[in-house]
Amino acid sequence: DRKTDIAVFRDGDWYILQSSNNTFRAQHWGAPGSDTAVPADYDGDGRADLAVFRAGAEASSPTYFFILRSTSNTEQTQQFGTTGTDRAFPADYDGDGKADIAVYREAGGIWYILQSSDNNLRGAQFGLGNFQDQPVPRDYDGDGKTDLGVYRKSSGTWYLLQSTAGFAGAQFGISTDLPVPADFDGDGKSDLGVYRDGTWYLLRSQLGFGAFRFGLAGDTPIPSVP
């Protein structure tokens, strides 16, 4: 219904409160303790699909995406990534309306994207790696494609590689802030935002700077970046 549903992922089980009919749904998809939830619309039907990212038992072993497609109720298993260095950041990087399988490799700050539009592998070095940057992929220029982005924790600086508008950099935040990029002013572009001890600091593309108190120190802000 184009509305985000309240949901939690617990030890391989999904608990979802569906906004369309206010009914509760529970479904098992994933392994207890080891999987990371990576829900996204992988098949382009307008509904988020249940999906998990699973690391291997040993360093340098392959990682896998396990996706339950909502359109066909079929499973997609995709080996993609390496244990110990890669983190999953699926999003629609090619603008075809489907989330692409993607990882950010801390060894070198390299993005690897499996584009759903043509099944081609795209690689791009953007970021320092070695856990110095927090990946923050979002659509910052409003062209319908997710842009590569990192938040450099040491300086509070944002570095964006926008698919249409090109490179951009901005200092916004301090080293202890949590990045919370999202479209806070409704213009179709993600805005820069950080959360600091219960205060949201936003740099909005239309409305400019704003600071709002909501939450307590130690809270996890939503939206947040994994």
Locations of regions flagged by a protein language model:
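Trp/Gly-enriched beta-strand/coil motifs that build multi-repeat beta-propeller-like domains
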Residues: 1-226
